[in-house]
Each structure stands twice: as C-alpha cells, then as structure tokens.
Regions:
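Short, solvent-exposed turn/loop segments enriched in Gly/Ser/Thr/Pro and often Arg
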Residues: 78-97, 164-173, 296-298, 347-349, ...
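Beta-strand elements within well-structured catalytic alpha/beta cores of enzymes
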Residues: 39-51, 70, 96, 152, ...
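Secreted, luminal/periplasmic, and some membrane-associated catalytic domains
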Residues: 78, 88, 110-136, 145, ...
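Bacterial Sec-dependent N-terminal signal peptides
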Residues: 1-34
Length: 539
C-alpha cells in the first residue's frame, strides 16, 4: 500500500515537472515571437510649422491612410513645447535632432552673424567645401555633438545608409548630421537638387534627375491650385470667409521663383517623389542593415504671409501634406513594409506671422537702425572715435569686437555701458548681456534666454520689448510682431507597429525629450548632448 502511494506521488510530481517545463518552453517560445528584429528602415519626418490644432480642425478633409494612420496607430504627443526665445525652424529642428537646446548644440537660427567677417551667413557656412549643383559652401561642423543619424551610423559601424532631403540647406544638414551619406536640398537659384562635398555620396540617380527630369521644365508647370474650393475655412474658427479659389504661378521676372515654391505644397510633393527614388533605386531598407531617411516638409503660410492673409492656401497646404504622407507610406509599404519600418513625425513649434496685431493694440515701434546709431554715438562719447556696432539682428546687438580690442577695453565693461544706454529706450523692458547669460545664476527667464543662446554666434546684448511693441530693422522695413511663446504647439508621433502602443498624450512635453524617446524606440544611444531620459521609460 505504501509502495502504491509512493508511486502515485512520484507520478504526480513527474507530471507537474513536465507541465512546468512545457509552460516554460511555451512562454519562451511566445517571448521569442514577440521580440522583433531591428527595423529595416527608419523615416524621420519634420514638418516646419505643423500645428496640432490645425490637424484636428481638418479631420473631415484628411484621408485615412496619411496623417490619420500615423495618429491612429502611433504614439502621439499632441503638445511639444520649446523653451526658446524667437524660435525658427532651424533652431527647432536642431533641438529635435540632438535632444539639446542651442546653448549646447550650437545652432541658434538659420542665419547667424559672423563677428570676424562682419556679415550675416548661414549657420553652416564653411568655405572649405564646395557645393554640388549649388554655389553655396556648407558643412555640419557648427552642429555641436551628435544627432540621431550619427548615432545610428555609430550603432551599425557605419553600415547603415543615411540620407536627408529638405527644402533648405540648413534643414537638410541638421537632419543628416556629421556622418550621413548625403544631405540634399533644393537650390534657390537653379531649382536643382543640391548638396555639399562634405558628404561623400551624391547619388547618380539624383544627378540624372537634375538633368533629365528637373523639377520644372517650363513655367506653365509651376502652378498651384487648391484641392477644395468653397466651403468653410476649418483651420480658422473666427474667420467667416469661405475658401476662395486661387492660382499661383511662381514666376518672377520671367523666371521661376524657387523660394516661393518652398512655401507651397509643390516642395512637399517634390521631396516625397525624390524620397521614393531613394527607396527604389537606392534600395533603402533592403540591404540587410537598418537604413534611415530624414525628410523635412513645409506646413507654413504661402510666402510667409500671416494666416489671415492666405487662409485658403494654408488649408490647402495641410490637405496636400496629408496626401503626400499617404503616398510615402504606400511606397514604403510596397517595398520595405510598414511592419519593418519605424516612422517618427514632429512639428517645429514655431508659426511665422500667425496673426497680425490690430492697430489699436500696437504700443509703438522699436527701430533697430536708430538704436544702433545712437548707441554708437554714446560709445564714442565714452571711449573715443570708432565703429562700435557690428550689427542688430534677431533682437540682438553685436558690438564690434575689433574696435574694443584696439582700444584695449574690457568687453564686459563695454557691454555693461551699452546695456545701460539701450535700457533707456522707449518700449524696452529688458536688456541682458552675454555675460549675464553665460555666468549668472539661472532663473526661469534667464534659463529660456540661455537655452536660445550660443557663445559662438550669440550677440553681446539681447533686447526684449514690452508687450505691444514691434521691432523694425529700419524706417523703411515692415514691423515684426513679437514672437508669442508656444502659441501653436505641434505634435510628435512615433509609429512603430509592435513596438509602441497607440496612444494620445495631451500633457505637454519638452522638445528635448523627443530625441531620447525615439532613440530608445530604435535601440540606439541618445545623441551626445542630450540630458533627458526617454518618455515612457521612467521609473
């Protein structure tokens, strides 16, 4: 009897062991099926001035396979904020690509003042390199640290193919970084796809397209008419006018005006068409390694007008942008497969000329040329004859450092004297010197200024006006309304089937959190200047 009981116990124990082993193997098998291989293709899409509220307002005019697909099947952060002053698309794109602000990444705006050459120039101007299909000289050397493209190159031991396409040189170079195969943009004068000899690979199929099928072979093809005419202007709830038909030809002085084209849907269509050639002829995502394609598109106003001056055009830009993204997704799905692709899409957080101020609300105008002329006279009275002012640009006064050195003066002393004088001008609420930004203890206001500043290109004085005041470069120029902070937050979307759970997050996030979150998703290091941790991965 005891023997039978012992045998029964032994059989039961053996059965439990077998069941446990089977369950463990089953769990292991299930876990193995869940783990995905590295993506074949990563596509980063940055859309200049993309607004979350405009996307929501146009839901009834968007298709199901473009922006809606990304938003319905991706992780969506609806409100990305930039802790910056006077933000432009270039500075915003640098923040998104590096996970750090200009104080660390070196890129304050598309155009910067060169103290040595005493002139404005591209932030990426570099005379050591010549252009491909352009007269410009560029390199990414002004970008401090790495970006996402650089980190993918490092992770793959330089095997990944990385390309960037954008309307302008600065945008293309920012996304490409230091180690990409090529950065490509549309040249303002020739309308050809251009690059810089800094990058080693300017694909032959792009060269052929420049000569065989240029962007426009004649003026008649350079036209823009709306998809919809009639009906309400959905993006502007307080505008009572209906959508109006329009036709823009982009011809100026009998030549095609390519800078105008860059503020229309035509540039987005051209970039998507070229990206399809990279996927097809360049075989991106089809070589056994993870490749990357960075695209910059446009969703701002036509010719940089205010929204109320061109509402029909602005709404059409969004409708066509949605169609372009649908076309891109279809091309990717037909070649690499969307299930093998990670896509992230971001806006730039800035809006050019959002709404003009009413005349009654304008308190006054601050004219930069008058300020610098009077300031120069004041410094002459203090320190003697000389050209004391270099430039006034983007709310910043640049002193002439050569004159200060020749007079054997301390730069900090001259900055202090100049700041005290400018502070007496009508409409000025604050004047902050570079020394304060670089060396004084932080407060919330100084932190924002510091984020926006970089010692390599920053001015000596930063001038802030009182509410209602407007900047004018000189008496003949148009007034520039003050930038409103975070007036139009844009989204950040991560589309990664099987890796991220579709979800909408309305809580605002900082723009520097986007890059480490994308890096975590694609399993690479965050860029070298990034100090944030990924969203959704916090303890």
């Amino acid at each position: 009897m005891k023997k039978n009981s012992y045998n029964a116990t032994l059989l039961l124990a053996s059965a439990l062991v077998l069941i446990s082993s089977f369950n463990a193997l089953s769990c292991f098998g299930q876990e193995k099926r869940v783990v995905k291989q590295n993506p074949k293709l990563i596509i980063g899409i940055a859309v200049d001035q993309l607004r979350s509220d405009y996307i929501q307002a146009l839901q009834n005019k968007l298709g199901e396979k473009g922006l809606k697909k990304l938003m319905n099947e991706g992780l969506v952060y609806e409100n990305v904020t930039f802790d910056l002053d006077n933000i432009d698309a270039t500075a915003a794109l640098a923040v998104l690509a590096t996970g750090s602000y200009p104080f660390y990444n070196g890129v304050t705006s598309a155009s910067v003042y060169n103290q040595e050459m005493i002139r404005q120039q591209s932030v990426f101007f570099d005379k050591q390199y010549i252009g491909n299909s352009t007269a410009g000289n560029y390199s990414p050397k002004a970008l401090i640290g790495t970006n996402l493209a650089d980190e993918l190159k490092a992770a793959s031991n330089n095997l990944s193919k990385v390309y960037s396409i954008a309307p302008n040189a600065e945008e293309a170079i920012l996304a490409a970084g230091h180690t990409a195969d090529c950065a490509i943009w549309l040249d303002d004068k020739t309308g050809k796809w251009a690059s810089t000899t800094y990058y080693r690979d300017f694909p032959q199929y792009v060269v052929r397209q420049n000569y065989d099928t240029p962007l426009f072979v004649d003026e008649k093809k350079a036209t823009w008419t709306p998809v919809y005419s009639g009906g309400h202007i959905d993006i502007m709830p307080y505008c009572k006018a209906d959508l109006l038909p329009f036709s823009h030809t982009f011809v100026k002085d009998r030549r095609i005006a390519y800078p105008w084209i860059k503020t229309s849907p035509i540039i987005n269509k051209a970039i998507v068409e070229l990206s399809k050639q990279f996927i097809k002829q360049g075989r991106l995502g089809q070589s056994g390694t993870t490749d990357m394609l960075q695209l910059t598109l446009y969703a701002g106003t036509y010719q940089h007008l205010s929204a109320e001056e061109s509402p029909s055009e602005l709404q059409d830009i969004y409708v066509r942008l949605d169609q372009n993204i649908e076309e891109l997704l279809s091309a990717v799905d037909g070649s690499v497969g969307l299930h093998n692709t990670i896509i992230y899409l971001t806006g730039t957080g800035n809006t050019e000329n959002c709404v003009s101020d009413l005349t009654e609300t304008v308190a006054g105008e601050f004219v930069g040329s008058r300020c610098t002329a009077l300031l120069n006279s004041y410094l002459i009275s203090l320190y003697g004859q000389g050209s004391w002012i270099g430039s006034f640009d983007n709310n910043q006064i640049y002193l002439n450092h050569k004159t200060i050195e020749q007079k054997n003066l301390r730069l900090a002393d001259v900055r202090h004297s100049a700041a005290e004088f400018v502070m007496m001008f009508s409409g000025v609420s604050e004047v902050v010197s570079a020394d304060q930004i670089l060396h004084e203890d932080n407060n919330a206001r100084l932190t924002r200024l510091r984020n926006s500043y970089n010692k390599n290109f920053g001015g000596d004085l930063l001038v802030e006006l009182q509410p209602g005041w407007q900047f004018k470069a000189d008496d003949a120029s148009k007034p520039q309304p003050q930038t409103r902070h975070d007036v139009a937050p844009g989204p950040a979307i991560i589309f990664a089937p099987g890796l991220v759970t579709p979800k909408h997050v309305t809580t605002p996030i900082d723009a520097t959190e986007v890059s480490p979150t994308v890096a975590k998703t694609i399993r690479i290091r965050a860029p070298s200047g990034c100090k944030r941790i990924p969203l959704g991965f916090k303890n």
